[in-house]
Amino acid sequence: ITLGHLNIITRAASIFDRLIVCVGYNQKKSPMFTAQERVKMIRKATSHLPNVEVEASDELLAHYARRKGACVVVKGLRAVSDFESEFTMSLINKKLNPELDTMFLTAEEKYMYLSSSAVKELAQYDVDLSEFLPAPVIDEFRARLNARR
Protein backbone atom coordinates (compact mmCIF):
# COMPACT_ATOMS: atom_id res chain seq x y z
CA ILE A 1 0.00 0.00 0.00
CA THR A 2 1.36 3.38 -0.99
CA LEU A 3 0.48 6.80 0.40
CA GLY A 4 -1.54 7.27 -2.80
CA HIS A 5 -3.65 4.21 -1.96
CA LEU A 6 -4.02 5.40 1.62
CA ASN A 7 -5.15 8.82 0.42
CA ILE A 8 -7.88 7.29 -1.76
CA ILE A 9 -8.97 5.01 1.12
CA THR A 10 -9.09 7.93 3.58
CA ARG A 11 -11.13 10.08 1.22
CA ALA A 12 -13.53 7.24 0.39
CA ALA A 13 -13.92 6.47 4.11
CA SER A 14 -15.09 10.05 4.64
CA ILE A 15 -17.81 9.56 2.01
CA PHE A 16 -19.21 6.18 3.06
CA ASP A 17 -20.39 4.87 6.44
CA ARG A 18 -18.59 1.59 5.78
CA LEU A 19 -15.66 1.00 3.44
CA ILE A 20 -14.33 -2.45 2.58
CA VAL A 21 -10.88 -2.55 1.04
CA CYS A 22 -10.72 -5.72 -1.01
CA VAL A 23 -7.26 -7.07 -1.80
CA GLY A 24 -7.58 -9.05 -4.99
CA TYR A 25 -5.39 -11.61 -6.69
CA ASN A 26 -4.07 -10.49 -10.07
CA GLN A 27 -2.41 -13.28 -12.02
CA LYS A 28 -0.77 -10.71 -14.33
CA LYS A 29 1.28 -9.29 -11.46
CA SER A 30 3.92 -10.83 -9.24
CA PRO A 31 3.38 -9.02 -5.95
CA MET A 32 6.09 -8.69 -3.35
CA PHE A 33 3.67 -9.76 -0.60
CA THR A 34 0.91 -12.37 -0.42
CA ALA A 35 -2.68 -11.17 -0.28
CA GLN A 36 -2.85 -11.95 3.44
CA GLU A 37 0.37 -10.03 4.11
CA ARG A 38 -1.04 -7.06 2.19
CA VAL A 39 -4.28 -7.27 4.20
CA LYS A 40 -2.25 -7.12 7.42
CA MET A 41 -0.26 -4.09 6.24
CA ILE A 42 -3.36 -2.24 5.00
CA ARG A 43 -5.08 -2.90 8.34
CA LYS A 44 -2.11 -1.34 10.14
CA ALA A 45 -2.05 1.65 7.79
CA THR A 46 -5.81 2.24 8.16
CA SER A 47 -6.14 1.50 11.88
CA HIS A 48 -7.05 5.17 12.47
CA LEU A 49 -10.12 4.79 10.22
CA PRO A 50 -12.83 3.02 12.28
CA ASN A 51 -15.20 2.45 9.36
CA VAL A 52 -12.62 0.66 7.17
CA GLU A 53 -12.48 -3.13 6.88
CA VAL A 54 -9.83 -4.99 4.91
CA GLU A 55 -10.26 -8.42 3.32
CA ALA A 56 -8.76 -10.52 0.55
CA SER A 57 -10.80 -12.25 -2.13
CA ASP A 58 -10.10 -14.31 -5.21
CA GLU A 59 -13.61 -13.69 -6.56
CA LEU A 60 -14.46 -11.38 -9.41
CA LEU A 61 -14.98 -7.93 -7.90
CA ALA A 62 -18.59 -7.74 -9.13
CA HIS A 63 -19.41 -11.05 -7.42
CA TYR A 64 -17.54 -10.09 -4.25
CA ALA A 65 -19.45 -6.79 -4.06
CA ARG A 66 -22.78 -8.60 -4.47
CA ARG A 67 -21.90 -11.09 -1.72
CA LYS A 68 -20.90 -8.24 0.63
CA GLY A 69 -23.99 -6.17 -0.18
CA ALA A 70 -21.87 -3.36 -1.62
CA CYS A 71 -23.44 -1.10 -4.23
CA VAL A 72 -20.41 1.09 -5.04
CA VAL A 73 -16.82 0.29 -5.97
CA VAL A 74 -14.29 3.09 -5.49
CA LYS A 75 -11.33 3.26 -7.85
CA GLY A 76 -8.42 5.67 -7.71
CA LEU A 77 -7.20 7.26 -10.93
CA ARG A 78 -3.77 8.74 -11.55
CA ALA A 79 -3.84 9.36 -15.29
CA VAL A 80 -6.00 9.05 -18.39
CA SER A 81 -4.55 5.59 -18.99
CA ASP A 82 -5.93 4.49 -15.59
CA PHE A 83 -9.34 5.82 -16.59
CA GLU A 84 -9.42 3.85 -19.83
CA SER A 85 -8.76 0.50 -18.18
CA GLU A 86 -10.88 1.21 -15.08
CA PHE A 87 -13.80 2.48 -17.17
CA THR A 88 -13.75 -0.74 -19.20
CA MET A 89 -13.70 -2.76 -15.97
CA SER A 90 -16.60 -0.73 -14.57
CA LEU A 91 -18.67 -1.64 -17.64
CA ILE A 92 -17.84 -5.32 -17.20
CA ASN A 93 -18.64 -5.14 -13.47
CA LYS A 94 -21.98 -3.48 -14.27
CA LYS A 95 -22.78 -6.27 -16.74
CA LEU A 96 -21.97 -8.92 -14.12
CA ASN A 97 -23.70 -7.04 -11.29
CA PRO A 98 -26.27 -4.46 -12.52
CA GLU A 99 -26.67 -3.10 -8.95
CA LEU A 100 -23.00 -2.08 -8.80
CA ASP A 101 -21.79 1.44 -9.58
CA THR A 102 -18.19 2.62 -9.83
CA MET A 103 -16.98 5.88 -8.29
CA PHE A 104 -13.69 7.28 -9.54
CA LEU A 105 -11.56 9.40 -7.22
CA THR A 106 -8.67 11.19 -8.86
CA ALA A 107 -5.32 11.06 -7.14
CA GLU A 108 -4.16 14.18 -5.41
CA GLU A 109 -1.45 15.87 -7.45
CA LYS A 110 1.34 14.86 -5.07
CA TYR A 111 0.48 11.17 -5.61
CA MET A 112 -0.17 11.14 -9.36
CA TYR A 113 3.27 9.72 -10.18
CA LEU A 114 3.23 7.15 -7.37
CA SER A 115 3.02 3.45 -8.17
CA SER A 116 4.05 0.27 -6.39
CA SER A 117 6.51 -0.44 -9.21
CA ALA A 118 8.17 2.96 -8.81
CA VAL A 119 8.49 2.46 -5.04
CA LYS A 120 10.09 -0.98 -5.53
CA GLU A 121 12.63 0.52 -7.89
CA LEU A 122 13.42 3.48 -5.62
CA ALA A 123 13.81 1.19 -2.61
CA GLN A 124 16.66 -0.62 -4.34
CA TYR A 125 18.64 2.63 -4.14
CA ASP A 126 18.04 3.18 -0.41
CA VAL A 127 15.80 6.20 -0.97
CA ASP A 128 13.83 7.46 2.05
CA LEU A 129 10.46 5.75 1.55
CA SER A 130 8.49 7.89 4.03
CA GLU A 131 7.27 10.10 1.17
CA PHE A 132 5.85 7.06 -0.63
CA LEU A 133 4.70 4.48 1.95
CA PRO A 134 2.77 4.63 5.24
CA ALA A 135 5.06 4.29 8.27
CA PRO A 136 3.72 0.85 9.34
CA VAL A 137 4.61 -0.56 5.90
CA ILE A 138 8.16 0.73 5.43
CA ASP A 139 9.98 -1.76 7.70
CA GLU A 140 8.15 -4.77 6.25
CA PHE A 141 8.81 -3.51 2.73
CA ARG A 142 12.55 -3.03 3.35
CA ALA A 143 12.84 -6.42 5.09
CA ARG A 144 11.20 -8.21 2.17
CA LEU A 145 13.34 -6.35 -0.33
CA ASN A 146 16.53 -7.25 1.57
CA ALA A 147 15.46 -10.90 1.80
CA ARG A 148 15.07 -11.01 -1.99
CA ARG A 149 18.62 -9.74 -2.62
Predicted regions and their residues:
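Nucleotidyltransferase catalytic core that binds NTPs
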Residues: I1-R149
